[in-house]
């Protein structure tokens, strides 16, 4: 209790100091020079963007269990060592290996028309000859329930307009189970994204328990969904033929990649920077989450380059298997359970870097005040405002276990979710300056949190 009180008193004392001459908190004065150096170094060139391009151009899609991901992991280990990061190593986890296989969808009535589609991660296959059936278009789960008698033997298509990802993704993840409960033979979902470019969006789905039959599940573009809706509105019985070879192979070994800048005074206290290194198998995973990995990694690389060693350890973890299993984040929690309380803060970037970007924080009021004041150092980047809701899927497990404050860096959601889980998630969509800005803000924030005398209060 005495230690906790001491931390809180130190935090309160720091925050109550009089403002500096520049109108910024005086307690930050010792950190301004190094924070400015990190920001200037990060924004001096497009090194970070070039590294995202190297990763995604060279290794492409990186779905769990793939050779591409394994090669990318080996590259990351070698490159972290070349960067001078310390304690570079890998940590083993077993991950699912879902294989897409060949797939196709076509309208057979009215006259033949090929529909772009992507099977959803975790889906089963169709029979070898495919499934041909009439389609039932519904706009919600409630409508499906009301029209349950019509669903038996049909392919159910959820035409649910995008509102936000958290709401609309429920039909991608749970739509197959909803449709199967009413006797459907397959489920299709309108692409989960704000803008249609005739691009389907893949993503994980979940059958739940074994009380309901498993049926094939896929996503189709907004435009094709609307076309089928219009046809059915005219009383036309639209028939579709779906073929999918999707299946699970046995679980395989994968690796989380770890690199550090060891703390000068409190090496056992950890400021964690996380991201996921895997991606879906249809794009190159540039925004989801190649760029998130590189901008976090840059924080440590820049500290090493500038000979800045904070008091606490800065640990970068490139997590495996976020997209279709969360085995990387959960494995890290399990392997570091004893050290969970020693994690001072966990940071994640997994929502792109498209402008306008934002920083967000989740933690105690006392910690929030400190982080908000550190944010004043980011004024040159336009990121001084720290919003609520920081966190991430990969850092969540260790943060929940250790009651660890969380932060995140997020890009514009409309731009991000337009290409999310699509073949269009490529590095050319990203502006180099936006990558540099993200790296700069993360580096400066992490440096101060890792170097200030008191740990963030929990």
Predicted regions mapped to residue ranges:
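Second-shell loop/turn segments in exported
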Residues: 35-43, 57-67, 104, 122, ...
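Metal-dependent peptidase/peptidase-like ectodomains
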Residues: 113-114, 128, 133, 215-220, ...
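His/Asp/Glu-rich mid-to-C-terminal helical/loop segments that flank catalytic regions of hydrolases
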Residues: 301, 305, 312, 417-458
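Bacterial N-terminal signal peptides
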Residues: 5-16
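Soluble metallo-hydrolase cores and metallopeptidase-like ectodomains found primarily
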Residues: 32-34, 108-110, 114-148, 205-286, ...
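Short helix-loop-beta-strand segments that form the rim/entrance of peptidase-like active sites
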Residues: 50, 302-327, 346
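N-terminal capping segment at the start of a domain
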Residues: 26-66, 199-202, 278, 349-354, ...
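Noncatalytic luminal/extracellular "stalk/propeptide" segments of secretory-pathway proteins
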Residues: 24-27, 31-34, 53, 57-155, ...
């Amino acid at each position: 209790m005495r230690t906790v009180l001491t931390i809180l008193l130190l935090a309160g004392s720091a925050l109550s100091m009089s403002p500096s001459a520049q109108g910024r908190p005086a307690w930050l004065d010792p950190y301004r020079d190094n924070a400015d150096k990190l920001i200037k170094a990060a924004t001096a060139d497009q090194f970070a963007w070039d590294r995202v391009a190297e990763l995604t151009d060279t290794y492409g899609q990186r779905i769990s269990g793939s050779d591409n991901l394994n090669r990318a992991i080996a590259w990351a280990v070698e490159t972290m060592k070349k960067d001078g990061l310390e304690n570079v190593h890998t940590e083993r986890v077993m991950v699912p290996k879902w294989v897409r296989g060949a797939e196709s969808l076509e309208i057979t009535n009215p006259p033949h028309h090929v529909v772009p589609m992507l099977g959803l991660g975790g889906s089963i296959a169709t029979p070898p000859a495919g499934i041909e059936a009439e389609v039932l278009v519904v706009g919600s789960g409630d409508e499906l329930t009301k029209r349950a008698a019509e669903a038996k033997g049909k392919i159910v298509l959820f035409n649910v307009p995008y509102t936000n990802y958290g709401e609309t993704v429920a039909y991608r993840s749970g739509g197959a189970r909803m449709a199967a409960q009413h006797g459907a033979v397959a489920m299709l979902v309108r692409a989960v994204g704000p803008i249609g470019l005739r691009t389907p969006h893949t993503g994980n789905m979940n059958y739940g328990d074994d009380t309901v039959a498993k049926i094939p599940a896929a996503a189709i573009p907004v435009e094709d969904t609307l076309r089928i809706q219009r046809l059915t509105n005219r009383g036309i019985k639209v028939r579709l033929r779906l073929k999918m070879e999707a299946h699970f192979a046995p679980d395989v070994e994968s690796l989380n990649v770890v690199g550090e800048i060891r703390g000068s005074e409190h090496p056992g206290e950890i400021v964690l920077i996380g991201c996921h290194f895997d991606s879906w198998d249809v794009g190159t995973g540039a925004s989801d989450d190649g760029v998130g990995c590189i901008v976090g990694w840059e924080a440590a690389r820049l500290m090493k380059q500038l000979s800045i060693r904070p008091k606490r350890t800065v640990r970068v973890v490139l997590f495996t298997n976020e997209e279709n299993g969360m085995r990387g984040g959960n494995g890290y929690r399990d392997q570091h359970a004893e050290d969970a309380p020693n994690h001072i803060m966990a940071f994640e970037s997994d929502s792109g870097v498209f402008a306008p970007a934002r920083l967000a924080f989740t933690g105690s009021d006392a910690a929030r005040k400190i982080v908000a004041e550190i944010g004043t150092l980011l004024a040159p980047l336009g990121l001084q405002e720290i919003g609520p809701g920081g966190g991430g899927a990969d850092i969540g497990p260790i943060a929940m276990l250790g009651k660890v404050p969380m932060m995140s860096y997020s890009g514009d959601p409309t731009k991000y979710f337009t290409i999310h889980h699509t073949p269009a998630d490529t590095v050319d969509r990203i502006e180099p300056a936006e990558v540099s800005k993200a790296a700069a803000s993360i580096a400066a924030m992490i440096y101060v949190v890792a170097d200030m005398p008191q740990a963030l209060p929990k």
